[in-house]
Amino acid sequence: MTAPTTRKDLMIVNMGPQHPSMHGVLRLIVTLDGEDVVDCEPILGYLHRGMEKIAENRTIIQYLPYVTRWDYLATMFTEAITINGPEQLGNIQVPKRASYIRVIMLELSRIASHLLWLGPFMADIGAQTPFFYIFRERELIYDLFEAATGMRMMHNYFRIGGVAADLPYGWIDKCLDFCDYFLTGVAEYQKLITRNPIFLERVEGVGIIGRDEAVNWGLSGPMLRASGIEWDLRKVDHYESYDEFDWQVQWQREGDSLARYLVRIGEMTESIKIIQQALEGIPGGPYENLEMRRFDRLKDPEWNDFEYRFISKKPSPTFELSKQELYVRVEAPKGELGIFLIGDQSVFPWRWKIRPPGFINLQILPQLVKRMKLADIMTILGSIDIIMGEVDR
C-alpha cells in the first residue's frame, strides 16, 4: 500500500469589513497555510466620503464641522490642523491664552484617543476588564469637553486666531481634579496589564519593526517612537506653546507590539503633566484675536438693538487664502497628521491634501503579519491603531 501524498492547500479567509473585531470597515483578505499567514491584502475605501474635494468648495469655517469626521476619536487635532494652515497663510497671531487652551484641549483629546485604543486592543487579545475601565476615565474627559465646547464629540471648537469660547467658570479646577484622579487610573492599568504574563505572551516580540524599516515606510507617532526613534512634532516643530512646558518624548527600542503599548501608556502620563502645567500657568487676556474688537463694539449704541441681536451677535469671519503653497502638520495620537494647502486668492482652497497617519501606518501591515499566526493579526492590527474615517477620508 502506497503512503498518501501530502497536499498543500492554501485557504483564503475574509476578515471584515462588517466584523465587530475589526477596527472600523477594514477588509483583510488573508491567505493561510494552516494557522500560518502566507499573504494579507487590505481592502480600503468603504468609508470614503470625498473629504478633500469637499474642502475645495467650502470656506474654512464652513469646512470645520466636516474635519471632525476624519479621526472621530481625536477631533481636536483635525480642527487644529484645519485652522493652523490658514493662520500661517494669513500670518494671523494667536493670543497666548488661546494657545494654552488649545494645548489643554489637544492633550485631553490625546488621552481620550489612547484610552479608546487601549480598551479594544486588550479586548482583541482576550482581556475584557480594561475595556470597561477605560470608559470610566474617558467619560470624565468627555464631561470636560461638553462643559467647555458644548459637545462631547465633534466639538467644532477651534477658530482661526483662537478658540470659539473661553473656558467656563470652575472648569480649570475640575480639570485639575481629573488630572490627579487619572494618574491613579494609569497606575492601575499598568498594575493590571504591563506585567501580566498572558498579555506579555501575546505582544512581546510580535510585529517587530526595525529602526530603518520604520523610517523607510514613513511611519510616525507611537509606531515610529516604539522603534527607537525619538521624534515628536511637538518638540520638532515648536507649534502652539509646547516649548514652555517640561515634558519628555516617550520612546522604546524594541519595535514590537509591547513597545507600542508602552509608548502610548507613557504618553498619557506626559499629557497629564502638560495639562497640569498649562492649567497652572494659563494667562489672562482674549481667547481669540477678534475678541478685542468685539469689546470695543460694546460701546456702540446699536449693539443692543433688537434687529442686530436678532441677526447675530458673533459672526464668524471668512479669510481669503493667499496664493501660495503650505504644508502644516501636528502630532496627533496616531502619528503625523498633515495638510498640504494651496491658496488661490480666494476664500476656497485650490487644493486640500490630507496626510492621515493611519493610512501611512497601515501600509506596513501585510509585511508584519506574514509568517505569523492567524491570531497575531488582531494583535498587530490593534497595535497600529487605525481609524477608518481618516484612512479612507
Curated annotation (Swiss-Prot):
Top EC class, one word: translocase
Keyword list, A-Z: Chloroplast, Membrane, NAD, NADP, Plastid, Plastoquinone, Quinone, Thylakoid, Translocase, Transport
SUPFAM superfamilies from the UniProt entry: HydB/Nqo4-like
InterPro entries: NADH_Q_OxRdtase_suD (IPR001135), NADH_UbQ_OxRdtase_49kDa_CS (IPR014029), NDH1_su_D/H (IPR022885), NiFe-Hase_large (IPR029014)
GO CC annotations, alphabetized: chloroplast thylakoid membrane
Claim: Plastid is one of the keywords in the record: yes
EC number(s) reported in the record: 7.1.1.-
Record membrane topology: Peripheral membrane protein
MF (Gene Ontology): NAD binding; oxidoreductase activity, acting on NAD(P)H, quinone or similar compound as acceptor; quinone binding
Location in the cell: Plastid, Chloroplast thylakoid membrane
GO biological process, one term: photosynthesis, light reaction
Reaction it catalyzes: a plastoquinone + NADH + (n+1) H(+)(in) = a plastoquinol + NAD(+) + n H(+)(out); a plastoquinone + NADPH + (n+1) H(+)(in) = a plastoquinol + NADP(+) + n H(+)(out)
Function, as annotated: NDH shuttles electrons from NAD(P)H:plastoquinone, via FMN and iron-sulfur (Fe-S) centers, to quinones in the photosynthetic chain and possibly in a chloroplast respiratory chain. The immediate electron acceptor for the enzyme in this species is believed to be plastoquinone. Couples the redox reaction to proton translocation, and thus conserves the redox energy in a proton gradient.
NCBIfam families listed in its UniProt record: PRK06075.1, PRK07415.1
Similarity annotation: Belongs to the complex I 49 kDa subunit family.
HAMAP family in UniProt: NDH1_NuoD (MF_01358)
Assembly and oligomerization: NDH is composed of at least 16 different subunits, 5 of which are encoded in the nucleus.
Protein name, entry field: NAD(P)H-quinone oxidoreductase subunit H, chloroplastic
Source species of the chain: Solanum tuberosum (Potato)
